[in-house]
């Protein structure tokens, strides 16, 4: 209790002392968008572009909700089939291939990331899985477990034992029959998804530190960050549902910096929380709207991007913020809308090049490549 109180006091103090609290205006960063970026085959449609990432060669990976869905709902499981698709394009936007077609863990796409070795990681919210592909497109690691693909009925209640059925001559003093058997015993309770450890419940994103440790944003229902070693062995997790520091309400996006600090987009609490590599709370940034996507650039001077992208019923302004890692806002760009250079719920950002970023949009069903001009911000 005392530790929680100390964390809260520290967070409040950092907020009032931080440059965020003092900033009254944010410069607008000019930018351009490349028209008709992705060249799709005639029979292929993109769908909701929930994930976008690039590799060291400039190839573009897009994780989409493109297929038709088939939902079967059990009493404690929901099974959704055939909605995730993963496409690869070259650096010019030319279509290269589809990866993982028909994969058992592809159900409801959420994000895609490319690690420093050019492995491709997809996060599937529907299957509760994180899946790693090597650059050739082979599955080399799976984390989490897909819920059962069949209906899971509730165990029937036990039948009450009926009264004994008597036969023969009652006057003889003994029953002529035996008591009827009881019905079948109830099945043991089944655990739902999201048990502690490496079982996820609607995970959303993944990141790595320099040692290769894996951080999974776990996500909608577990309200935690789970840490694994480079081989996928579970180490620890932190977080719970709530509004205090180190608590979350939809862990929607995650990134790490060169020092191994972990930045978590706490979407419904409308803040970014920062932790050290072991999950100890460090800071929070609270004036960048609802962070649907965060991305940290590589290189010696790292920048943090965060998208403020609520849905159509609560759109906000739809802008993207460019920040220092300490939370100082350097500028913003974009607004909600359907035209080029406007955004329809930016769900993921790729920022391998700090001034050339890719954004995947849900409601506009597209990916935009943006060229920023921060030196012209005003």
Regions found by a protein language model. Give the residues of each.
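Eukaryotic scaffold repeat domains enriched in small/polar residues
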Residues: 21-378
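Positively charged n-region of N-terminal signal peptides that target proteins for export
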Residues: 1-5
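Bacterial N-terminal signal peptides
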Residues: 6-19
